[in-house]
């Protein structure tokens, strides 16, 4: 069994034209149940080593807070200290052979596709499109592991998309043909991110990937972005997203919701 942690970066809801957040990224961190406890322990040790008590009651690892801290607690530590911690966490992921699957969506390009395909007034959250693509890679990855192992999705609790995510997983698990998620069991599970260090690690990965993808569309990057990307890139598992099939599925599901449109 594999635990598949999902988190996003660059979520601007229905605003697909925000110049400050041109890219949405969904990441999935794939963790074997045999390694889960060891990963949690290693992450916790790194936290205790880097972030001394007393900590704020709402203490949580957020990549954006480590890069550009707003709280007094994290501002008290120099950038080099915060970078060393992020590097340590990403090294833990590599040491335990965790795999990362992601999908980046350029929002303006996605917006143009929506208008071209459905006309004005139709909104599909980029999270749902990215989930459908990422899930195909994950399903293939699990199927190719010896014994064709199973996996379960665990997502950050996001009320904005939780219902649609749950629906998409259910539909894809029951889909006909090659898109069917044969290796994913049950529904998606949602937990509060402060309760899961692995989910917080996924948040860090998603941030790093988003910054890299923003650089690809012309956004200026900083040296820290390149440093962190060099640690994330080796974790990435590539695979067939079945893009054409997913696009057809999105179109079909939208037509079911808007019969006669």
Regions found by a protein language model. Name each.
Residues 1-261:
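Phosphate-ester processing/binding pockets and catalytic centers
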